[in-house]
């Protein structure tokens, strides 16, 4: 009986130590996020550069999908939710449709999506950058207009991906200053 109690204590202490080590690992990756963010944004911009001309040439609409109200949400108290929803929107709605424009485009859009997933994963690990619950009306509007535009919505959303990267940068800069 005495040895089983000792074994339980050892298992508990090992779990506490492992949890503390994982927390420290997560904290240390969060410490490096502000310095690695410019590199991640450069990678996103470079990956987008490979499809930018294609989608901007196909975008025949003269209005913006990613409006000032979305940027205002990124800068305001809904910044976290707006960023999270927009990443999800691009990954689940825009990019799967954008991949349907030939094998070269698919390869580059897929690469862009992987870089966006990596950014999302790093932000989620650092809860101070993505700790959100509320919905953004600006994102809902982007999604509604995107749906209304049908195929043209893909061209519009992809042609404005650089604006989205700028909004990510604005959000992250605001968060790092706090």
Swiss-Prot record:
Where does the UniProt annotation place the signal sequence? 1-18
Looking up PROSITE patterns in the UniProt record yields: INTERLEUKIN_10
Q: Which GO terms describe its biological process?
A: immune response; interleukin-10-mediated signaling pathway; negative regulation of B cell proliferation; negative regulation of cytokine production involved in immune response; negative regulation of inflammatory response; negative regulation of interleukin-6 production; negative regulation of membrane protein ectodomain proteolysis; negative regulation of nitric oxide biosynthetic process
Q: Name one GO molecular function term.
A: cytokine activity
Q: Which Gene3D superfamilies match?
A: 1.20.1250.10
Q: Which residues form a coiled coil?
A: none
The protein's matches in InterPro entries, at most eight in alphabetical order, are given as: 4_helix_cytokine-like_core, IL-10, IL-10/19/20/24/26, IL-10_CS
On the tree of life, the source organism's domain of life is Eukaryota
Q: Where in the cell is it found?
A: Secreted
Q: Does the keyword Cytoplasm apply?
A: no
Q: Which cysteines are joined by disulfide bonds?
A: 30-126, 80-132
Gene Ontology CC terms: extracellular space
Keyword Glycoprotein on entry: yes
Please provide the record's keywords in A-Z order: Cytokine, Disulfide bond, Glycoprotein, Secreted, Signal
Q: List the carbohydrate attachment sites.
A: 134
Pfam families from the UniProt entry:
IL10 (PF00726)
What function does this protein fulfil? Major immune regulatory cytokine that acts on many cells of the immune system where it has profound anti-inflammatory functions, limiting excessive tissue disruption caused by inflammation. Mechanistically, IL10 binds to its heterotetrameric receptor comprising IL10RA and IL10RB leading to JAK1 and STAT2-mediated phosphorylation of STAT3. In turn, STAT3 translocates to the nucleus where it drives expression of anti-inflammatory mediators.
Family, similarity comment: Belongs to the IL-10 family.
**Summary of subunit composition and partner proteins:** Homodimer. Interacts with IL10RA and IL10RB.
From the Swiss-Prot or TrEMBL record, give the protein name: Interleukin-10
Q: Which organism is it from?
A: Bos taurus
Q: Read off the lineage from the record.
A: Eukaryota, Metazoa, Chordata, Craniata, Vertebrata
């Amino acid at each position: 009986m005495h040895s089983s109690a000792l074994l339980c204590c050892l298992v508990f202490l090992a779990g506490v130590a492992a949890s503390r080590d994982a927390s420290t690992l997560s904290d240390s990756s969060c410490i490096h996020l502000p310095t690695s963010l410019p590199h991640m944004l450069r990678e996103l911009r470079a990956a987008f550069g490979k499809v930018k001309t294609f989608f901007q040439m196909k975008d025949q609409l003269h209005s913006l999908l990613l409006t000032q109200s979305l940027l205002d949400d990124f800068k305001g108290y809904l910044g976290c939710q707006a960023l999270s929803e927009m990443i999800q929107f691009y990954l689940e709605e825009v990019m799967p449709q954008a991949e349907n424009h030939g094998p070269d485009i698919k390869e580059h859009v897929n690469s862009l999506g992987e870089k966006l997933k990596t950014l999302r994963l790093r932000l989620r690990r650092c809860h101070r950058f993505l700790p959100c619950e509320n919905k953004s009306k600006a994102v809902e509007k982007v999604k509604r207009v995107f749906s209304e535009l049908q195929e043209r919505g893909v061209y519009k959303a992809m042609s404005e991906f650089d604006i989205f990267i700028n909004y990510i940068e604005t959000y992250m800069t605001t968060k790092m200053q706090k």
